[in-house]
Amino acid sequence: MHCDIYRSSKKDEMYLYIARPDYPNDDVEGQDPLENVPEGIRTVFGKPTFVMHLELSQSRKLARVNVLHVLDSLQTKGFFIQMPPEGFINPSDEPEGLRGA
């Protein structure tokens, strides 16, 4: 399964994998890469910045996510969102307030 990976403009370490099932015969130039992603995710994700194109298989290792979860999501939804790792704090982010208060 081929996919393109985009970085979020709003959240550090958030990435979106977009399925490219017809690669290399598809023509994605000029298209909105997030056109098939739900509006709520698009809003949180912000402007996508292209990072790379990958060919995924069950034997491929990914740094932070299980490739089987990514492949399943790409096949069923057409996309996979990789959230920032827990505990990741961006010092330039605005404070979110007290949690659990």
From Swiss-Prot:
Q: Which domain of life is it from?
A: Bacteria
Pfam families (alphabetical) = YcgL
Q: Which residues form the YcgL domain?
A: 1-93
Signal sequence region:
none
Report the SUPFAM superfamilies cross-referenced here: YcgL-like
Query: Do you know which HAMAP family this protein is assigned to?
Result: UPF0745
Q: What is this protein called?
A: YcgL domain-containing protein ACIAD2309
Q: Which organism is it from?
A: Acinetobacter baylyi (strain ATCC 33305 / BD413 / ADP1)
Give the organism's phylogenetic lineage. Answer: Bacteria, Pseudomonadati, Pseudomonadota, Gammaproteobacteria, Moraxellales
